[in-house]
């Protein structure tokens, strides 16, 4: 079991380490490069990854309904448990709760799912990523920007390239229209490039980790996988998941906070320095939390 877990996580954290090392060597110049990389991922490669994963012939959306319901339960339970913890610790819930709910199921979760459960796991992992992003851009924004913006503003955030690529992919998954295979393969090649590039970009972001606001960062790094795994146990008790689905759900639940939490905190000026600490310390602590989730998931 230990060897299998190491075989899964070492390549992922290896690419993150390469990104971190590259950022250290490049210095301040790396920020503009990372910005261009993120724009490329968000506007082209990420949408193509979502489209090709969902439109693939072996992806059946109806079969993934229990897994998606499980992911929604994990997100909901995480928020419900994190809220009183934030109050007890003296944190602003708008700062602390969203990073506990919305995890790094994109640039860390996708490659981990493929390495742990094989290429067939990419479609379900993308579906959970899409669900999490949709809730993040709607419910998550409402929590962070409580009282600042109307509902229609947060709904407009859903009209981004990632969501558009997802919508087209879902339409293909339902209707199954004819599509030239060579063209699909070309789009898939581009989409697959998104995964290592997201890991590399995450490594670049790690250079911003500092000791500032360490208390909320450390507490968040502990609470995030704990409440997530609690949600996974609740979902597992309520839903009829197969072995692979159960494994993917526990992996999803153990992931650290998404980097998107920091971006939204900056946009809405909701203590972004504290959210940055939660996000970055949490991703560093994933070296411990992800193997725990994998062990629980692979045990099935």
Task: Please describe what each predicted stretch is.
Residues 1-300:
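Alpha-helical transmembrane segments of multi-pass small-molecule/ion transporters
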């Amino acid at each position: 079991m230990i060897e299998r877990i190491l075989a899964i996580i070492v390549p992922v954290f290896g690419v993150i380490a390469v990104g971190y090392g590259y950022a250290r060597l490049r210095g301040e110049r790396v920020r503009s490069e990372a910005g261009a990389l993120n724009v490329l991922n968000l506007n082209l490669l990420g949408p193509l990854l979502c489209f090709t994963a969902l439109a693939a012939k072996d992806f059946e959306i109806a079969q993934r309904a229990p897994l998606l319901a499980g992911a929604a339960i994990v997100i909901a339970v995480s928020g419900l448990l994190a809220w009183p913890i934030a109050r007890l610790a003296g944190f602003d819930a708008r700062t602390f709760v969203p990073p506990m709910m919305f995890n790094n199921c994109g640039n860390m979760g996708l490659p981990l799912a493929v390495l742990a459960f094989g290429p067939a796991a990419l479609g379900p992992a993308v579906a959970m990523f899409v669900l999490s992003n949709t809730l993040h851009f709607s419910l998550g924004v409402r929590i962070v920007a409580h009282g600042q913006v109307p509902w229609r503003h947060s709904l407009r955030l859903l009209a981004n390239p990632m969501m558009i690529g997802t919508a087209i992919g879902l339409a293909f998954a339902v209707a199954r229209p004819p599509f030239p295979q060579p063209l699909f393969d070309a789009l898939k090649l581009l989409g697959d490039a998104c995964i290592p590039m997201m890991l590399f970009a995450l490594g670049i972001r790690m250079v911003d980790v500092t000791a500032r606001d360490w208390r909320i960062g450390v507490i968040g790094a502990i609470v995030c996988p704990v409440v997530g795994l609690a949600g996974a146990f609740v979902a597992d008790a309520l839903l009829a998941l197969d072995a692979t689905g159960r494994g993917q759900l526990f992996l999803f639940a153990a992931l650290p906070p998404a980097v998107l939490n920091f971006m939204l905190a900056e946009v809405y000026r909701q203590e972004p320095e504290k959210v940055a600490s939660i996000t970055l310390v949490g991703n560093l602590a994933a070296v411990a939390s992800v193997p725990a989730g994998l062990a629980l998931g692979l045990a099935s």
